[in-house]
From Swiss-Prot:
Class of the enzyme per the UniProt entry, highest EC level: transferase
Protein family according to the UniProt entry: Belongs to the RNA methyltransferase TrmD family.
Reactions catalysed according to its record: guanosine(37) in tRNA + S-adenosyl-L-methionine = N(1)-methylguanosine(37) in tRNA + S-adenosyl-L-homocysteine + H(+)
GO biological process: tRNA N1-guanine methylation
UniProt entry keywords in alphabetical sequence: Cytoplasm, Methyltransferase, S-adenosyl-L-methionine, Transferase, tRNA processing
General function of this protein: Specifically methylates guanosine-37 in various tRNAs.
Top-rank taxon: Bacteria
Statement: the UniProt record of this protein carries the keyword Methyltransferase: yes
Major location (coarse): cytoplasm
EC number in record: 2.1.1.228
Record lineage: Bacteria, Pseudomonadati, Thermodesulfobacteriota, Desulfuromonadia, Geobacterales
Name this protein carries in UniProt: tRNA (guanine-N(1)-)-methyltransferase
Amino acid sequence: MKFDILTLFPAMFDGPLTESIIRRAVERGFVDISLHNIRDYATDRHRVVDDAPYGGGDGMVMKVEPLAACIEAVKAERPAARVILTTPRGRRFDHDAARELAGYEELIIVCGRYEGIDERVRDLFVDDEFSIGDFVLTGGELAAMVMIDAVIRFIPGVLGSPGSAEYDSFADGLLEYPQYTRPVEFRGVQVPGVLLSGNHAEISRWRRQKALELTRRVRPDLLHKAELSSSDRDCLAMLEREGEP
């Protein structure tokens, strides 16, 4: 999968895109990531990429010409690439959105800055817009990093275990169950006995119940769209009767 990131601050991506799973994905040829400095496409001697907004107001707006030139240069090499803009105005980026974007072979991610971009960039070039939450960041670079990390997890072969992405939190609409590893006891706190039993059916049942409990307590809104079986609903009803928080 090919990612082209359009940004005013390419150095911000050192580290997040050069370590851990993303680094291994690049080294193994599953992912190709290129950074493009929008400022390189400014045509004036001072390489200006922003200007005051028409109509007045605070802050500056990213100019259309450098952005257009940068997008067109990348699209000339990858005409089928989907152009994504990171912006608070976008639709919510979540587990399903990450899976959706993983279905594309080429993505161009435009990182917004300042008070936003000239609207004509949206009108002429952008295919989709995403926001990672109801808050404002200094720029779209951090959002782009989050999105790339989440999308890459769905690329076959990237994760060590083929089922890892499918068992993550949100994969089936629920938060993930609690995880434990050695030692069995730490400062008086024991690993639940069922996880040591070797009974895979009981372990699966325990994990599902804990996922339901956690989701009900922390993110009850997720239950409205989760894929719940009749036994899941029975478990939730039992928790309600027992007054579990």
